[in-house]
Amino acid sequence: MMRFRSAIFLAMVVATGCGGDDPLTGPGGLTLSFTPVALDLGTTRSATIQITNTGAADVGPIELAGGQVAGPGGLPIAGSQLSATPSQFPTLRAGASADITIDLTLPTDIQSGSYQANLTAMVDQQSAAVLTVDFSVPVVSPFFGTVTITSGTVTPRQGDVETYTAEVRDSTGQVTTGETVTWSVVPFTAGLADASGRVVGYTPGAASVVASVGGVTDELDVTILARGAPSGSFVSIGEGSVTTRFTSDHWEHGNVAYTGTWGCRDGSGNLCGTGGVLGNRLFVWDISVPSAPVLTDSVAIDARTLNDVKISADGSLGVITHEGSSDLMNGITLLDLADPLHPAVITRLVDSDLFTGVHNVWIEGNYVYLAVDGSGLRIADISDPAAPTIEASFYGGSSFLHDVYVRDGLAFLSHWDAGLIILDVGDPTNPQEVSRIDIPGFLVHNAWYWPAAGYVFLGDETGSPGVMRVVDVRDLTAPVQVASLSISGAPPHNFWIDEDRGIGYFAWYELGIQAVDVTGDLMGRLELQGRRI
């Protein structure tokens, strides 16, 4: 897994290294297959299929390429498209399967008959599996009425979600609500429309919003305006370096920064198995002068990795995590921050439940939420910091809980291949599952909940292309993915949302920090909407 150098970057977001191996790639010997191997949709336009890696090695990244539909004689049908969601998998584990939703987009004037399209799984730009999709277009009973687009802007801004409405009248001229209106954008590369008439523009310039009923259409010509997102650049204003250890996590409170360490680093600055310096130390920095951070103290613990550090909201208490402790007990250490530049150890919480290691934590009130390696969530009462006790637990299934984020009485669990799990922790001693969303092929690594917007931003650390996904949780009982941000070359890591300004800061491994405009309703592919700052 890729790692940052040991330099500590005093910025809003610092990417934290996590353990793992790079996915194996390459077309030779790939054993990907679709189920079914051929599909007849009949007159439907969508279906769920599976892709399976039947081999012994992980495979990725996998691109799912659709394309135009072929009509009689094999000629492509203009305005047609077979698409897949998700359109890519950073990694498909050996023996694993993932669901894929395929959708057909067809021009409104397509003739009745039989048609065919192919979905190809590509690895290293070579075909690894092909699914043949057959479907038919029936003779449509003619609709003798009219459809008229009645509202919606003709100058939508790129990336803004606009709502369009249409009026349908039957052959007698009476308004009817018994017909289903189908919405689309022409050309399809110009934007995305959903079934309710919500449209988001991708490409600035001329386009059309189309409403269709039974072969009768109305088109509204629109001009998609460039988004004009703010532009800028990051400027390094200060740096503090520790050359003997790798830096893991970073947390700031007031004018103090706290940084963790991980792994084993040898004298040449390389990752080592033994014989080097372990990641067993928390460093404390005075950043009251950001251009000249000063290392003021450190705290050593029994660990190979101090992966996470969190500070209580009032700044009085710190929590650091243990992984790879020599006594095999691991757990967490609580710190007294009466003098924030010189923490004092209060106690260490160990338990047989924690021996595998604690990867991440969150402090909320008198409780600490612990993401325990391989065994889910533990909730500890720290109302008496000298005598913390574990009060509750939760496990989301046969997967790895990587991170936990708590806000407004809710805990958001980044539960790897079990997806995002939302818990009601109004009573921290009795957590209750509210809902979950499992995104096929997506290993949920981290989450940020933005209550005012009603969104959760999810990261996946598995490979390239890296994908951040946006989940709408305005109905907490029914989370649904509504948008994504895909950037090739590296996976994302940790996020921080400036909610006042509507800017997301996304750590993206060697691609640095990505600043993205996340204002307004979010829908579709954000990387096509001129939102990257």
Which residues does each PLM region occupy?
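C-terminal motif of bacterial Sec signal peptides marking the signal peptidase cleavage site
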Residues: A15-G17
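Surface-exposed binding patches on compact interaction domains or structured appendages
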Residues: D22, G26-S33, A56-I102
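Terminal connector regions
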Residues: D109-P138
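Feature marking well-ordered beta-strand scaffolds used for ligand recognition
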Residues: L225-I533
